[in-house]
Curated annotation (Swiss-Prot):
Gene it is expressed from: rpsN
Name of the molecule in the record: Small ribosomal subunit protein uS14
Organism of provenance: Novosphingobium aromaticivorans (strain ATCC 700278 / DSM 12444 / CCUG 56034 / CIP 105152 / NBRC 16084 / F199)
Function recorded in the entry: Binds 16S rRNA, required for the assembly of 30S particles and may also be responsible for determining the conformation of the 16S rRNA at the A site.
PANTHER family: 30S RIBOSOMAL PROTEIN S14, SMALL RIBOSOMAL SUBUNIT PROTEIN US14M
Disulfide linkage: none
Amino acid sequence: MAKLSSINKNERRKKLVEKYAAKYAALKATADDQSLDETERLIARLKMAELPRNANPTRVRNRCNTTGRPRGYYRKFGLCRIELRDLANKGLIPGVTKSSW
């Protein structure tokens, strides 16, 4: 199990990303728009820099839903590899079977 403080920190980041998502997307679109002149794009980049650091979606870490483990994460299931294997062997994940050939 991951440290509870790490899990909570990641949850706070998710909330911040959600809060600033629309503003961040609008500023990013303005900053990346090649048809605008350089000063407008620079102003948009400076406004993006004023947003909280944790409002950037790249700072959110995918974590296992059951253990909070940050590594070996399978997006399709929302689980780490260890929990995925454990639950699949117990038959608790519908449609997942052991491979045999």
